[in-house]
């Protein structure tokens, strides 16, 4: 398939620049992957789509304040976006500057409300990423909390605000490391989670530290030629056990977000390669899911509306059928749903392969 097959026209005013006042106030477009049938509603309707005995799998990554501003010691402004924490004092990062810093370049980073500055050094370059070492005794996470900004996606097209520290973060986040939010999870608040559990729906948590690569455009014509960026994922034993128990009782595995889908399917892919049943997974993954992929774990998913020609709309198309998904997106535009990270959501069931 061609990347252009996944294009759709999106009016600029449908891009959500701010979240709704309440997490659960978003709209929900329900898509039956088997028939293509659509149903319009509110996000709280997700409760009606869940059955006792189902398993809801969330991504518990925490977004770090990964964007920093500063200058080279010799002058020249720069912007740093952390991609991955290497150790207590070093990161891999994207650097925007008029001239890329060379190894040994001293950096002066700031951004704290009290004018705090942090010294750092560019140690090495790894393709498009720069290895930056902080010349500060504090751990990286503490430095980022002091001077970093929330790394809002480029299409939100505004500076981060104090409210984003809470709203560009799920209520169940636990493990710091993401530089983009697992956005399907932003719609859940504690009262809704309590209702879900009260209904007899089980919950489990995987971790995938979403990287900035999630916003990179696909730069090839044929989707088969695309190489995914790599991200770290964890599927612990308790999740494997929960999936087995769900299967045994006839329940469904429902992933909240494409990152949860990719985590679970990465674990399945690794296990399948060893001809073994589903096993825990703690590794980098560059799994690329596009039409033709055979899903091993996930039966339904909650997901936001994604960018045209993105790997994420390709994943959803693989899940529910290309024609069904593109028709759903056209309907969403016509009905003026809000798109992308702070936008509305879909509840999608899987299209079963024809025997």
Swiss-Prot record:
Q: Name the Gene Ontology molecular function terms of this record.
A: S-adenosylmethionine:tRNA ribosyltransferase-isomerase activity
**Reaction(s) catalysed (UniProt annotation):** 7-aminomethyl-7-carbaguanosine(34) in tRNA + S-adenosyl-L-methionine = epoxyqueuosine(34) in tRNA + adenine + L-methionine + 2 H(+)
Task: Please state the Enzyme Commission number of this protein.
Answer: 2.4.99.17
Example of a GO biological process term: queuosine biosynthetic process
**Locations listed in the record:** Cytoplasm
| Any one GO cellular component localisation term in the record | cytoplasm
Could you tell me which SUPFAM superfamilies the record lists for this protein?
QueA-like
Q: Does the keyword DNA damage apply?
A: no
UniProt main location, coarse: cytoplasm
Recite the UniProt keywords alphabetically.
Cytoplasm, Queuosine biosynthesis, S-adenosyl-L-methionine, Transferase
Q: What is annotated about its quaternary structure and interactions? A: Monomer.
Know the name of this protein? Answer: S-adenosylmethionine:tRNA ribosyltransferase-isomerase
- Which species does this protein come from? Aeromonas salmonicida (strain A449)
């Amino acid at each position: 398939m061609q990347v252009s097959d996944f294009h759709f026209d999106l009016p600029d005013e449908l891009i959500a620049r701010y979240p709704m006042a309440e997490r659960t106030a978003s709209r929900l477009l329900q898509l039956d992957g088997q028939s293509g049938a659509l149903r319009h509603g509110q996000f709280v309707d997700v409760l009606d789509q869940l059955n006792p005995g189902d398993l809801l799998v969330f991504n518990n990554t925490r977004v770090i304040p990964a964007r920093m501003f500063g200058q080279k010691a010799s002058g020249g402004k720069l912007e740093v976006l952390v991609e991955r924490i290497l150790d207590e004092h070093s990161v891999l990062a994207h650097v925007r500057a008029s001239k890329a810093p060379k190894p040994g370049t001293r950096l002066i980073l700031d951004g704290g409300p009290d004018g705090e500055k942090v010294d750092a050094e560019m140690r090495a370059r790894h393709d498009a990423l720069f290895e930056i070492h902080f010349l500060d005794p504090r751990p990286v996470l503490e430095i980022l909390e002091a001077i970093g900004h929330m790394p809002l996606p480029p299409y939100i097209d505004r500076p981060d605000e104090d409210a984003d520290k809470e709203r560009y973060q799920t209520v169940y986040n636990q493990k710091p490391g993401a530089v983009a939010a697992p956005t399907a999870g932003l719609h859940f608040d504690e009262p809704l989670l309590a209702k879900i559990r009260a209904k007899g729906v089980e919950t489990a948590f995987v971790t995938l530290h979403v990287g900035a690569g999630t916003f990179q455009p696909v730069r090839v014509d044929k989707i088969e030629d695309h190489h995914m960026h790599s991200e770290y994922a964890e599927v612990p034993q308790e999740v494997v056990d929960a999936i087995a128990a769900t299967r045994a009782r006839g329940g469904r595995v429902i992933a909240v977000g494409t990152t949860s889908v990719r985590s679970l399917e990465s674990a399945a892919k690794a296990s399948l390669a060893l001809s073994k049943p589903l096993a825990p997974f703690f590794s980098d993954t560059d799994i690329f899911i596009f039409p033709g992929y055979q899903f091993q774990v996930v039966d339904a998913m909650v997901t936001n509306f994604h960018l045209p020609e993105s790997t994420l709309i390709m994943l959803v198309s693989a899940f529910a059928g290309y024609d069904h998904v593109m028709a759903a997106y056209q309907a969403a535009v016509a009905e003026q749903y809000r798109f992308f990270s702070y936008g509305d959501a879909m509840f999608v069931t899987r299209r079963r392969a024809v025997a």
